[in-house]
Amino acid sequence: MPVRAASWSFTEDDFGAITQSLQRFLHDSNARCALLVDRTGQLVATVGEQPTFDATAFATLTAADFSANDQLARLIGESDFTTLFHQGERESMYLADVARRVILVVLFDNRTTLGLVRLKVKQAVDDLTELFTRVFARPTGEGAPNVLAGSDDEIDKLFQ
């Protein structure tokens, strides 16, 4: 059964390939967790350590962060920023654009370095871009369940 998000959907095989790519990335980078979020703020996949926070709210805020930074890029004459980095005392996150429609979010701590994460993200983004390019090129099937139904109500509840 296809999973639907925005105007595209992917199959169980697609999801398996995406998950395998993320698992390989986590192993190679020693990062804690990788999340895929579409540009509308919908959580597509989570691999690695399960987040201890509300992943749905996090996905929404991640998409908003990436969108805001795209606008900042335009203000300084860039078309966009393809990666973002946020550093904390104990936890950091690295965000990367995948195929202009999905955001790879990497959560990591002092078990790895920013340099290693950046190095391994490049290959992961290339792999995921190839996978998602095929998914986006495929016609969406009729009758695929619309997982966005009711999402406006859920988003409103987050901020009440």
What name fits each language-model region?
Residues 2-33, 40-160:
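Acidic, low-complexity cytosolic segments
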